[in-house]
């Protein structure tokens, strides 16, 4: 299973894997690979930045997620979202909360 991995500046430490089941035979025409994402999710992520192309069959393991879980989601829905570790999510939530409070009392 081949996939492309994207990151999003609005979402630190979040990565989206997009299935490329027909690779390399799918490169003849330009395609919106992120079109498989639900519209609301895609809009909330902001502008994508391509990171890399990955052949999961050649990859023994992934850094923070289970490779089998990634493959299952790629096959069933065409994408996999790797969320940030819980400590990063907590820090982001706290920063947004503080920012909201600061704006409220300015």
UniProtKB/Swiss-Prot annotation:
Start and end residues of each YcgL domain: 1-94
A Pfam family the protein falls into: YcgL
Stored InterPro entries: YcgL-like_sf (IPR038068), YcgL_dom (IPR027354)
Signal peptide start and end residues: none
Protein name: YcgL domain-containing protein PsycPRwf_1721
